Amino acid sequence: MYRIVCALLLLTPCAGAQTGHLLLRKPALSGTQIVFSYAGDLWSVAREGGDAKRLTTAPGVETDPVFSPDGSTIAFTGEYDGNVDVFVMPASGGVPRRLTYHPGRDAAVGWTPDGKRVLFVSARAVPNDGARLYTLPVEGGGLPEELPLPIALEGSYSADGSHLAYVPLFQWQEAWKRYRGGQTKKIWIANLADSSIVKIPRDNSNDFNPMWAGDRIYFLSDREGPVTLFYYDTKTNKITRAIAKHGLDFKSASAGPGAIVYEQFGELHLYDLKTGQTKAVAVTLAGDLPELRPHYVNVAKRLRNADISPNGARAVFEARGKILTVPAEKGDPRNLTNSTTAMEREPVWSPDGQNIAYLSDESGEYALDIVNEVGTGEAAKIPLGKAFYSNAAMVAGRQEDRLPGQPQSPVLRGPRSEEASVGGD
């Protein structure tokens, strides 16, 4: 019925180098540099920050970088040959070399303390939603050796290689904040000689990303609210919060010589293991990033939250955070919002067919925006307060009244019969 819609995303690319909240992911730390994933590629920057250097440029995604103990080599997860496998490359850059060849997904996790083998996770021998940890010689050759653990995902060796701190449970909904169901993550410490374990104490919190440093096992946890850094002392069996809660979750972290690098709100930070002090790492990115250029995107398969105009002539959709209308028969598609920094959701047509209401987070909190169905002029904005709204039709109540003396000024009523003027002064 409706024709395919192609929407021009009017992005605003940076004219020069980029700084600030760049969504720098999965950082790894050596004695001199930090390697991280950005826009599907690996980048390197000095520990003190500065201009980042691009290490990979393949069409697929490269992520999960981990430094060898001497800092000379990086193991990472890549998609160079149409499959997700483990690769290694010099820390200074170079041609990646493939280590794993299983048709399933293999992902880099770490290194053995002697730097001779790469630790990786794979579901190659585990049914359902499980996985196991394996090691493979960094020089290649031979078969992967499976660690003696039934299910294991993330892992970090003790200095002598005799023990491993690991996560023994797969969690399918990792982004569920403050989840307290049956799949909360935990960290166990395994004696690799006999597979006996010690459980790091917790009260059904999500503990993950273990990092062994000296006699301590550092890890990320939401046991006190937002995810931050804690450590477990293997000598005293006590748990201490290393970094105070900041309100924003830490997403990943990696231990290196004398410090831990972690990502928070798209930025990188260093935690000094001796002083306990933290500092932000200022990173500047400059490169050819096609994703930042304005480009056409076919959104025919991404249309959602549809509504039909009262006369049936057009339909409105949400697609990639934009509000679009398309004709039933004749006419052109219309991008009503054309925004670059906001998410617009849940469009609904007014009963008279003249306006379209939708939810927008342009101000930082969701507001009810109303624009004429042609998309011309500024949208009227109705603040909704600091609450969660998921349906513009529910907020609007599908009711339209008129202000006294202003017959062309619609009023939308909220669920508590609160009135908000849309078209009047």
What residues fall within each predicted segment?
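Signature of short aromatic-glycine-proline-rich micro-motifs recurring in repeat-based ectodomains
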Residues: 298-307
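A flexible loop/linker signature enriched in serine peptidases of the S9 family
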Residues: 18, 37-43, 58-62, 75-87, ...
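Mature N-terminal segment immediately following signal peptide/propeptide cleavage
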Residues: 19-49
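N-terminal signal peptide c-region/cleavage motif recognized by signal peptidases
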Residues: 12-14
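Glycine/alanine-rich phosphate-binding loops at beta-alpha junctions
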Residues: 52
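Sec-dependent signal peptide recognition
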Residues: 1-7
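Residue-level detector of Asp-centered blade-edge/turn motifs that repeat once per structural unit
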Residues: 29-31, 69-70, 113-114, 159-160, ...
